[in-house]
From Swiss-Prot:
The active site is at 81 (nucleophile), 183, 185. It catalyses: 5-[(5-phospho-1-deoxy-D-ribulos-1-ylimino)methylamino]-1-(5-phospho-beta-D-ribosyl)imidazole-4-carboxamide + L-glutamine = D-erythro-1-(imidazol-4-yl)glycerol 3-phosphate + 5-amino-1-(5-phospho-beta-D-ribosyl)imidazole-4-carboxamide + L-glutamate + H(+); L-glutamine + H2O = L-glutamate + NH4(+). Its EC number is 4.3.2.10, 3.5.1.2. It comes from Symbiobacterium thermophilum (strain DSM 24528 / JCM 14929 / IAM 14863 / T). IGPS catalyzes the conversion of PRFAR and glutamine to IGP, AICAR and glutamate. The HisH subunit catalyzes the hydrolysis of glutamine to glutamate and ammonia as part of the synthesis of IGP and AICAR. The resulting ammonia molecule is channeled to the active site of HisF. This is Imidazole glycerol phosphate synthase subunit HisH. Gene3D superfamilies: 3.40.50.880. Keywords: Amino-acid biosynthesis, Cytoplasm, Glutamine amidotransferase, Histidine biosynthesis, Hydrolase, Lyase. The keyword ATP-binding does not apply. Heterodimer of HisH and HisF. One of its GO terms (molecular function) is imidazoleglycerol-phosphate synthase activity.
């Protein structure tokens, strides 16, 4: 069975993510132990709150390096909401701050003129085929709760786009790294399907590892 770990850095709806994974057949442990995080078969980095505080909490517990270590080892890493933003190079919430630097991109506040944070359902437009989107319609609806998003021209890692005041990547990814700006655990069937797809990706990767 895949060892999926939900990273506990004091910012996230951990139980709801774990329950959603369980609903689609995958058990996950919640841990703030860097060794458990670095040694997981798959990592979920959830998060609700401010970019700077998130990075501080990760660093204080040694979890920033543990996530980087897991990513460098090719373990699947899934960032959700703030967790997705922390995977990127930089965020400007509370002033420019470096992120984990695992994916390109900078996080900036969404433009004024619409209610912020964006809370509720919005369309997600996949831009290319990806196993994460298997079985989903194009576009599909998902549940958002955020005031910051990737800014500028969509980077090469953009897998899906959403419009709210401006068009921004709502799903990003490269190799074993994936980030979702919305909350799949709150996004009904589409969100559960994405979590199931990601869980299968973790299991498929385990099955291809050489035996030791």
């Amino acid at each position: 069975m895949a060892r999926i770990v939900i990273v506990d850095y004091g910012m996230g709806n951990l139980a709801s993510v774990r329950n959603a994974l369980r609903a689609v057949g995958f058990e996950a442990a919640v841990s703030d132990d860097p060794a458990a995080v670095a040694g997981a078969d798959g990592l979920v980095l959830p998060g609700v709150g401010a970019f700077g505080t998130g990075m501080q909490n990760l660093a204080r517990r040694g979890l920033d390096q543990a996530v980087r270590q897991a990513a460098a080892a090719g373990r699947p890493v899934l960032g959700i909401c703030l967790g997705m933003q922390l995977l990127l190079a930089e965020g400007d919430e509370g002033g420019p701050r470096p992120g984990l630097g695992l994916l390109e991109g900078r996080v900036a506040r969404l433009p004024d003129g619409l209610p912020l944070p964006q809370i509720g359902w919005n369309l997600v437009e996949p831009q290319r085929d990806h196993p994460l989107f298997a079985g989903l319609p194009t576009p599909f609806w998902a549940y958002f709760d955020h005031a910051y998003a990737v800014e500028g021209e969509p980077p090469s890692t953009a897998l899906a786009l959403t419009d709210y005041g401006r068009t921004y990547p709502s799903v990003v990814g490269r190799g074993n790294l994936l980030g979702i700006q919305f909350h799949p655990e709150k996004s009904s069937r589409a969100g559960l399907r994405m979590l199931a797809n990601w869980g299968r990706m973790v299991c498929d990767l385990i099955s291809t590892r050489p035996s030791t």
